[in-house]
Amino acid sequence: NLYQFGGMIQCANKGARSWLSYVNYGCYCGWGGSGTPVDELDRCCQIHDNCYGEAEKKRCGPKMTLYSWECANDVPVCNSKSACEGFVCDCDAAAAKCFAKAPYNKNNIGIGSKTRCQ
């Protein structure tokens, strides 16, 4: 679920940046998304959005699905047994790892309503 996703983000970036820093970033980080991703981090969010879309097609409620995971050496590791839990956990873990590798550009905060995301 989204709370667990926040924990995964903290795990992968070693606590360097709060998950809240990603809520209003670029065109895809946060609720919804449109247009072309503005950078690598925004692309991570677009991929995560698409992954959640696939989870919804499988009738897995990705924003609310609870799963089992642990932080092992700054890497989120999924331990879920059910198909839905595993799928959603994998979406979140992949995004958290992607976020940790991508540069963070403060100029891309709050641009969602601008023409760059049309």
UniProtKB/Swiss-Prot annotation:
UniProt keyword annotations, A-Z: Calcium, Disulfide bond, Hemostasis impairing toxin, Hydrolase, Lipid degradation, Lipid metabolism, Metal-binding, Platelet aggregation inhibiting toxin, Secreted, Toxin
UniProt-listed Enzyme Commission number(s): 3.1.1.4
Residues bound to Ca(2+): 28, 30, 32, 49
One Gene Ontology term from the biological process aspect of the record: phospholipid metabolic process
Disulfide bond positions: 11-71, 27-117, 29-45, 44-98, 51-91, 60-84, 78-89
SMART domains linked: PA2c (SM00085)
Protein name per UniProt: Basic phospholipase A2 acanthin-2
Organism of derivation: Acanthophis antarcticus
Lineage: Eukaryota, Metazoa, Chordata, Craniata, Vertebrata
